């Protein structure tokens, strides 16, 4: 039934204009033929007959037929008496359609939850189309606020699809004008907000206005989920400082997330194929995989093209590593200007060397020397991040090795489908980064990741309370600061993609029960904890991977350990090597918290 309804809807959307034009022509033909047949017996003069026929046809379209209902009329005239007013009504309604839809859409924000989108441009319209079709059978309500009025040919299809379009001075209006506009939007009914102007400074200006409005008129249902487009990251320091100022519980009425198309593409890449798939495959088919804890090999990532997308892939891969204990993520960058770009990346992220090993291959990707330059690299994963689809495909074809190759096909849906269906040199390649799959509520507002993170946080708190703090109530998700939420999202993604599948291969149910039963006794006894880890190498390996992932996350956010500047506000005493962590009795006790994720999602 749903397929038939969709087929009829598509047919009407495609042929609506032609069907209405055909109906108008049929009505005009009936009006002329019927009027001619009706007046020809009564009028002998030819010129007068033509004039009367034309005038009668016009009157039929204006709801004023010349003949009465009781008068005998030809069949064509009788049909025209009903068909012509119908065509006139359709034409009048289409002229008023934009105004009527806008008024009804504006009224519906009082009664239905909606998603607010502030922005302009093709990417913004793609996101709006994805949002309005994301509500299942009933389309989700979307309100689009633009800086300047949209052309009718763009606005009318949106409003026909259930999107209400407003042109409001949220960016450059006076404070009074912004207040009036925000009160008209009734943000207490909003389910989320997306600030998606190409100019990032406008997004930040709207963010401050929305925050001030919600502080004055607070919502009853908690913080408003808000996604802020950050573009190329030029304003990232300002946005990071803003988030640090509002880290405290209840400090901001907004649950702020930052996004860019490059970061969304990187997340999409590793959602399609996990970074640690090669490491997990090494344990398949083994009779006793728990005895192969020393055979795990670190991931070796090749990034072709170190632009905004390549940088985002590097950071996302670092968040999903390590895949082997005591080994940094090994990244090789292939670009014509690799040395200069790597120097810029290292200056931008000064702690990057603590969790990533970087190498540069500076050469033309279309060079005949490319296979020789990459020979023996031992890569386990490759990401081709060039913006030009043809260059990306040629680079993927030139790569040699039995490892997955993600090919960025930005805006090339047809090429992406062909790549999915092709074999030969592209049998190991898969597409990522298509705009239609990126600009969705699940990725932009992070609903899918947040659902997984909230479930992970609830399970983690329940285990922590049961094992260590029975009298302490768990901390709710909304009470966490922005850094802790980001940390939980990263932890949930890593556990779901790598740590839990690895645990299921390494640990039996009996070993898991031993860990669960012994953990509560080890919290205050470092010696017992060391004994547990030495007796069960698989448990020690999983705890070490989680500790090193956690260290990498804090290093990426500017934190320093004992070997750094301890006067820095971003200091944590447990940011140390695994062996050093175990040697110190106080820091060794924190390994218990690295073991809690292993107990979640029992096999």
What are these regions (language model features)?
Residues 2-32, 41-55, 63-544, 577-579, ...:
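Cytosolic regulatory regions of ion transport systems
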Residues 557-565, 586:
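C-terminal amphipathic alpha-helical interaction region
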Residues 567-602:
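Amphipathic alpha-helical binding modules
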């Amino acid at each position: 039934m749903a397929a038939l309804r969709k087929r009829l809807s598509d047919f009407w959307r495609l042929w609506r204009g032609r069907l209405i034009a055909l109906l108008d022509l049929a009505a005009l033909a009936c009006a002329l033929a019927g009027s001619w047949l009706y007046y020809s017996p009564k009028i002998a003069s030819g010129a007068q007959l033509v004039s009367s026929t034309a005038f009668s046809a016009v009157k039929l379209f204006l709801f004023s037929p010349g003949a009465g209902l009781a008068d005998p009329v030809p069949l064509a005239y009788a049909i025209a008496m009903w068909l012509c007013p119908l065509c006139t009504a359709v034409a009048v309604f289409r002229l008023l359609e934009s105004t009527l839809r806008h008024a009804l859409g504006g009224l519906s924000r009082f009664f239905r939850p909606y998603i607010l989108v502030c922005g302009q441009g093709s990417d913004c319209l793609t996101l709006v189309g994805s949002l309005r079709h994301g509500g299942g059978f009933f389309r989700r309500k979307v309100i689009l606020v633009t800086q300047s009025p949209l052309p009718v040919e763009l606005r009318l299809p949106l409003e026909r699809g259930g999107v209400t379009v407003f042109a409001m001075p949220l960016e450059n209006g006076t404070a009074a004008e912004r207040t009036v506009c925000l009160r008209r939007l009734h943000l207490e009914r909003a389910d989320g907000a997306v600030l998606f102007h190409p100019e990032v400074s406008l997004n930040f200006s709207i963010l401050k206005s929305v925050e001030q409005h919600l502080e004055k008129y607070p919502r009853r249902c908690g913080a408003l989920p808000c996604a802020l487009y950050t573009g190329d990251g030029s304003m990232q320091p300002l946005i990071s400082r803003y988030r640090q100022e509002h880290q405290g519980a209840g400090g901001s009425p907004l649950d702020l997330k930052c996004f860019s198309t490059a970061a969304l593409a990187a997340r999409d890449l590793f959602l399609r194929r996990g970074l640690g798939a090669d490491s997990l495959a090494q344990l398949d088919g083994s009779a006793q995989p728990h005895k192969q804890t020393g055979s795990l090999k670190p991931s070796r990532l090749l990034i072709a093209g170190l632009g905004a997308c390549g940088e985002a892939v590097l950071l996302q891969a670092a968040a999903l590593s390590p895949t082997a204990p005591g080994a940094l993520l090994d990244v090789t960058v292939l670009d014509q200007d690799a040395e200069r770009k790597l120097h810029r990346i290292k200056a931008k992220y000064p702690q990057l060397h603590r969790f990533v090993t970087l190498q540069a291959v500076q050469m033309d990707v279309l060079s005949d020397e490319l296979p020789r330059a990459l020979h023996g690299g031992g890569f386990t994963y490759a990401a081709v991040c060039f913006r030009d689809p043809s260059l990306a495909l040629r680079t993927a074809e030139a790569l040699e090795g039995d490892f997955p190759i993600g090919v960025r096909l930005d805006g090339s849906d047809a090429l992406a489908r062909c790549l999915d269906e092709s074999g030969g040199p592209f049998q190991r390649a898969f597409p990522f980064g298509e705009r239609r799959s990126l600009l969705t509520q699940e990725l932009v507002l992070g609903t899918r990741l947040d659902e997984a993170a909230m479930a992970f946080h609830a399970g983690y708190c329940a285990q922590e309370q049961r094992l260590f703090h029975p009298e302490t109530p768990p901390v709710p998700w909304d009470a966490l600061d922005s850094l802790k939420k980001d940390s939980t999202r990263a932890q949930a993604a890593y556990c779901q993609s790598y740590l839990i599948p690895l645990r299921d291969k390494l640990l039996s149910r009996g070993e898991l029960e031993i860990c669960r039963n012994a953990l509560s006794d080890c919290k205050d006894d470092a010696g017992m904890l060391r004994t547990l880890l030495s007796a069960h190498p698989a448990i020690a390996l999983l705890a070490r991977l989680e500790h090193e992932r956690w260290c990498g996350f804090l290093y990426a956010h500017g934190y320093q350990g004992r070997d750094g500047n301890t006067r820095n506000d971003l200091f944590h005493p447990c940011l140390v090597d695994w062996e050093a962590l175990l040697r110190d009795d106080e820091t060794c006790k924190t390994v218990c918290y690295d073991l809690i994720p292993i107990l979640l999602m029992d096999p």
